[in-house]
């Protein structure tokens, strides 16, 4: 498992340079709400993000809230904005949708192209209702997050892929990006870099996927990659966790960044 994680981490660094976006880091006291479906409801990737902040910035408390519900589409999310999401009083709101919105079984039916177009138009119409609500939140920073992919290419036993489903998802991600630009919101994409990692490793192992045994729900490795990509968009990749320099003769810290050095003793 450790070796696999190291390999995936290396793949992240080589596969994501072209997909990097800019999301402002969270600030002290902020309330970060992640709105989404079952992938968010699982509670992993945003808890990893929170853990990063807690361990790297222990004196800068933030609150992270899980706003995911399994099976949700943009239509469902819009219906629960007031009673659920806005009730959490977000200062930053991450918005992810598309997996359920894009549909499933009909992609293997007689008219997959027509079905994909229908679900795309339906999803955009539903999202636009949320977009209107978000515009009325002057004190809330909106971050559009392109969803993790539906993995059509992994070879899984007894699991026939819904061909071109992820193409519909990618169109929705592109619309999210355009919406963010139009409204001066922030945007980052999980779909493209995770797809690139999947396809890179599937060249050697066709059964490899970050998207779980159902092609939809990322496993723990997948959630760790999602957290990495989000933190990368916030500008943290490559930054030192802590840095210190000690003068042994003087028994004192010459340099201490993001850490505290005390009780220095010299032997010999």
Name what the model sees in each region:
Residues 1-22:
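Bacterial Sec-dependent N-terminal signal peptides
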Residues 21-32:
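Membrane/wall-proximal cationic-aromatic binding patches
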Residues 26, 47-61, 72-224, 228-247, ...:
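Alpha-helical cap/lid subdomain in secreted, periplasmic
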Residues 30-44, 70-73:
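Catalytic nucleophile-elbow at a beta strand-turn-alpha helix junction centered on a G-D-S/GDSL motif
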Residues 66-68:
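Conserved residues in the N-terminal Rossmann fold of short-chain dehydrogenase/reductase
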Residues 248, 252:
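Acidic two-metal-ion nuclease catalytic site recognized across multiple nuclease folds
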Residues 257-260:
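Extracellular or exported targeting regions of proteins
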